[in-house]
């Protein structure tokens, strides 16, 4: 019995180490891809395009981080993390959140365009917000795979979806020669992740369902995570949010 437990423990440790190696490796590759794409895109688009996309990214990242209630973390640590009702309730929360975030981008687009003196935001922000709507329907198989330390597969699919999104940005920017290439490319990347995770991650398909006990646990768990993500936004995006109100789009794009 002790030998069996020891073998199981060593197996979990080895799986965790492999997953960590995959995660670290994919991060390095993602940074290289991002650097390469930026070098190409700077030759295709004017600085104003990057300024507009910076403002779009600040808004989208802010909405995602300020609405984070820790559903993914709750699935990973909960005793009910493999229960179908629990997972479907989490999926329902994710889908509702993604839909509301997209509607919020539509509602905030015009006021933010006025605040930042960037009329382009009025119609580009709602389109970019479609990526939040799409991401809301990502399957809970992602969290389940992470829970069971299938990190290699998760990081590989995430890396592939990023590569597809970057390729779409570069290709569309070459054709459109405008910020629309960046906006649509981001949507393509979100759609690629949705399809890849639904097709290639193991587990039952999600459906809309509401379990009151599960919903309370999922939302209650994340009340402290909200505070940490809010602080994270201020540290990572606060400078862009502030400078965007004082710099021109060209200057912000260069920054």
Predicted segment positions?
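Interhelical loop/hinge segments that connect adjacent transmembrane helices in multipass membrane
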Residues: 1-12, 16, 152, 195-236, ...
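Interfacial/gating helices of multi-pass transporter permease domains
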Residues: 32, 38-64, 120-123, 217-221, ...
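Membrane-embedded alpha-helical segments of multi-pass transporters/permeases
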Residues: 35, 39, 43, 66-69, ...
